[in-house]
Amino acid sequence: MSHPALTQLRALRYFDQIPALSPEQLDWLLLEDSMTKRFEQQGKNVTVTLIQEGFVSSDEVSSELPLLPKEERYWLREILLCADGEPWLAGRTVVPESTLSGPELALQTLGKTPLGRYLFTSSELTRDFIEIGRDADLWGRRSRLRLSGKPLMLTELFLPASPLY
């Protein structure tokens, strides 16, 4: 199963440099903290619509492969993050199987829990980079995060109803 927003997320093209955007837009796109928390600060009830979750082969994560270790399988989670029931963000998380050890095994059991609620409670979270991307009129970003030094990729597409626009 897929969703049109996730098709658009996979079509994002990334900028080599930070594009000329308003300070408000850059504040959203370059946010280092939890997007879930940021949405909640807007006074919204944040929920997850789970689109896909499970192991996939490297063929299904080809755009993330150059930024992750080469492995046989990856844990893929695709979601819509909704604010008061309205989709604000499409999210795609790609986790190499080798990352899924110790506490990071919890990444496989998030279900409808927002990723940010797990990631940003870890004292072992670091972010290697944020890249800003665009497809048509929508903006997005991708980050390589590390939990206890183990990598994962997070790609987010801001949907038209989100406060970015």
Swiss-Prot record:
Predominant cellular place of this UniProt entry's protein: cytoplasm
Lineage: Bacteria, Pseudomonadati, Pseudomonadota, Gammaproteobacteria, Enterobacterales
Functional summary from the UniProt entry: Removes the pyruvyl group from chorismate, with concomitant aromatization of the ring, to provide 4-hydroxybenzoate (4HB) for the ubiquinone pathway.
Origin: domain of life: Bacteria
Pfam families: Chor_lyase
Chemical reaction(s) catalysed: chorismate = 4-hydroxybenzoate + pyruvate
Disulfide bonds: none
InterPro entries (alphabetical): Chorismate--pyruvate_lyase, Chorismate_lyase_/UTRA_dom_sf
Claim: Transmembrane is one of the keywords in the record: no
SUPFAM superfamilies with a match to the protein in the record: Chorismate lyase-like (SSF64288)
UniProt keyword annotation of Cytoplasm present: yes
GO biological process, one term: ubiquinone biosynthetic process
Keywords noted in UniProt: Cytoplasm, Lyase, Pyruvate, Ubiquinone biosynthesis
Family that this chain belongs to: Belongs to the UbiC family.
Name of the protein: Chorismate pyruvate-lyase
GO MF entry, a single one: chorismate lyase activity
Record-level GO cellular component terms: cytosol
UniProt-annotated binding residues for substrate: M35, R77, L115, E156
UniProt-listed HAMAP family: UbiC (MF_01632)
Known partners and oligomeric status: Monomer.
UniProt pathway: Cofactor biosynthesis; ubiquinone biosynthesis
PANTHER family the UniProt entry points to: CHORISMATE PYRUVATE-LYASE
